[in-house]
Amino acid sequence: MSLPSLIDLFSLMALGAALGLFGGLFGIGGGIIAVPVLALGFGMGQALAQGTSLSMMVPILIVGLWKYSRKHPIPLPSAIYAALLASLTTYFVAEFATDLDQGALRAIFASFLLILGVQMGWKSSGRFSEKPTSIVSPKWMPFVGCFGGGSMGLLGVGGGLVATPMLTYLFGQRQALAQSISMALVTPCAIVALFTYNAADAVDWSVGFPLALGGLATVSRGVSLAHALPEQKMRSLFSGMLVVTALFLLIKPYVMH
């Protein structure tokens, strides 16, 4: 592990700032962007890129969760159960996923995100109610953690991308509150994963630390922006982000070949 030059240091902090704003706005850690940037821009292997991105994601998620919960208190019992199920699912699915074709998994996940994004975009562009209705009993909400944790276990990213639309569409949660609950279930998964990667010496702290500093400087602004925007606008932005992410995941193997 070598120390970055001054130019690299400012570049990393700028990247972290952009990812912090992005993560705060959408209630995610930003790893789905950070991993390919670190792999392509800094020549890191996949495992090192994922571990290093986690060192940035964890503080962003913690601060983001705190900021979100101050504006919209999280239903603690559901959030705790969801986080526990997400952590357990992440661990067991990760053990199982090591023998699976990662390319096929990525394609399936990307297709799923694309369908979610298009559906959210279609619903938010039509007749829209500021008071979403639930089509599934709230007692099942903790099991969203299984789907978010499954995504984290299979691909190391995407827990919040899966959980948030499920919370808005199935359980009638407002977008900002759904992102808050999503952060609550993803954060413990990211912490466990960071300790695991660090134990395997797969975290470059000289890169992760300036990324985290930059992210911490802007995540609060992202959270404030998420709460300032109208509900329909936030759902439209989130659906667009899902579509762009899905398309990127589909072309990623060809770009990073």
Predicted regions and their residues:
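Transmembrane alpha-helices of multi-pass small-molecule transport proteins
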Residues: 52-67
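Juxtamembrane transmembrane-helix boundary motif
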Residues: 1-21, 33-35, 40-41, 46, ...
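Small-residue hotspots at the loop-to-helix junctions and early N-terminal turns
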Residues: 46-50, 179-183
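Short hydrophobic/aromatic, small-residue-rich stretches within specific transmembrane helices
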Residues: 53-57, 182, 186, 207-212
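Hydrophobic alpha-helical transmembrane segments of multi-pass integral membrane proteins
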Residues: 115, 180-193
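Transmembrane helix boundary and interhelical junction motifs in multipass membrane proteins
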Residues: 25-34, 156-166
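Proline-centered helix-kink/hinge sites
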Residues: 35-36, 59, 164-165, 188, ...
